[in-house]
């Protein structure tokens, strides 16, 4: 390899660069396969999910494809479907047996990533056994409940509907993030009275 590069350098820089391109592409693919588990079938699956193409999602052959990260989005297929608010694909992946606790690119599992999205997806994930209190493995180390206090949706800071659901299924109201902030404290910091009242009525004084 080094001998070939030296020969190319000595002849012409343009030819040298052109000859290096395939080598660079090959190296990138090899690294991608090692780091992200890249394969063509996986990328077709990820593209199908991004395009909400349910028929193509159904064609995925190997279970392992569902538990790898997509190259372009750097997310798992399940979290990608959640981000697209595509409950049909989420249901399909869960029925197939995808790892519901697998973390995405920022350290959050499926439920954490769903908290500021479709309520029906949140309910579906809980129904399939998602860990209510699973924290981010990186950064703030916050729980889904803490995240629900700052979704900034529909003119409100907190997603009170999701707070209710999480509390109903046993979310730890006293859980703190890396800075020692609870869900109630976060709601108070943002002066979101609806979330404050809801959390206080659930037993936090």
Curated annotation (Swiss-Prot):
Q: Name one GO biological process term.
A: RNA processing
- Please name the PROSITE patterns in this protein's record: ANK_REP_REGION, ANK_REPEAT
Q: Which organism is it from?
A: Rickettsia felis (strain ATCC VR-1525 / URRWXCal2)
Does the record bear Repeat in its keywords?
yes
Q: Which UniProt keywords apply?
A: ANK repeat, Plasmid, Repeat
InterPro entries associated with the record? Ankyrin_rpt (IPR002110), Ankyrin_rpt-contain_sf (IPR036770)
Keyword Phosphoprotein: yes or no?
A: no
The intrachain disulfides are none
Q: Which Gene3D superfamilies match?
A: Ankyrin repeat-containing domain (1.25.40.20)
Show me the ANK repeat boundaries. 73-102, 106-134, 140-175, 179-205
Looking at the record's lineage, which domain of life comes first? Answer: Bacteria
Transmembrane portions of the chain = none
The protein here is known as Putative ankyrin repeat protein RF_p42/RF_pd42
Q: One GO molecular-function annotation for this sequence?
A: RNA binding
